[in-house]
Amino acid sequence: MPFRDAEYSAIAKMPISGLVRIGWLGLEGDAVADRVHHGGWDKAIHLYPQDHYPFWRERKPGHALLDQAGAFGENIASSGLTESEICIGDRFTLGSAVLEVSHGRQPCWKLDHRFGAKDVMATIVKTARCGIYFRVAQEGEADASVDTHMALIDRPQPEWPVARVFRLLIGGGHKGDPAAVRELAAMPLLAEAWRERAAKLAG
């Protein structure tokens, strides 16, 4: 999808069916246009909770993008798994693959552009409805044609839900809890980019 000034984005995702290969860098056939800011080991899979869609429909009534999953560029559309309930380092099975939570998604201007609005990115920052990135801990396959269940198999850091980390590192909360930010800077299970961000915020 072409964006401004000849930039390209692969944010536009469509529902798929059938058996899908899940490799180290994501779903087989998934396009990543901006490899500097998207994709890679820590951003292999993006989940955006379907639980948030009613919130967005209230704010963007009649917007066609919200008629189906994929509006936020997510690879996985889930219900019952939100940023407040999923923690850094959580491991889930998806088909025969194992996914590990690496960090939340830091929103960028492309979401505003996609929705034709100026407030989507700011609303995500304010509400922590950011979505979740996973790294692939074990390659495998999942059948997108059926209601595939993501099963939690490990939770090493229950005190670190994605929403809390997002508010500290992206939402401005670092000013009120510098000790937590220093802890994040040294957290091996947190994505490298967010560890680096935490280190800068900690000074």
Predicted regions and their residues:
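Residue "hotspots" at secondary-structure boundaries inside conserved domains
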Residues: 84, 139-142
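Short hydrophobic beta/alpha edge segments that flank linear recognition/processing sites
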Residues: 148-154
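Loop/turn positions that initiate beta-strands
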Residues: 89, 141-148
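Electropositive, beta-rich accessory/interaction domains or terminal extensions
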Residues: 1-112, 119, 154-203
